Amino acid sequence: MRKWVRQAQVDAGARPGTTTEESAEIKRLRRDNAELRRANAILKTASAFFAAELDRPAR
């Protein structure tokens, strides 16, 4: 109960801290960042694969 009261005070601006809205945005941004990192890793792997294919001598 005390935590809810403190969070309500933060949301109202009566107490310093991270508001509920800011916390939700940070959570969303971290999730997006993780997704982009996974996509980046996949693209790096794919580019390395295709670069290796290009380096092979033609038959």
Swiss-Prot record:
Sorted alphabetically, the keyword list is: Transposable element
Organism of origin: Mycobacterium tuberculosis
Query: What is the protein name given in its UniProt record?
Result: Insertion element IS986 uncharacterized 6.6 kDa protein
Q: Which domain of life is it from?
A: Bacteria
Q: Where is this region: Disordered?
A: 1-26
Similarity comment: Belongs to the transposase 8 family.
Q: What is the lineage of its organism?
A: Bacteria, Bacillati, Actinomycetota, Actinomycetes, Mycobacteriales
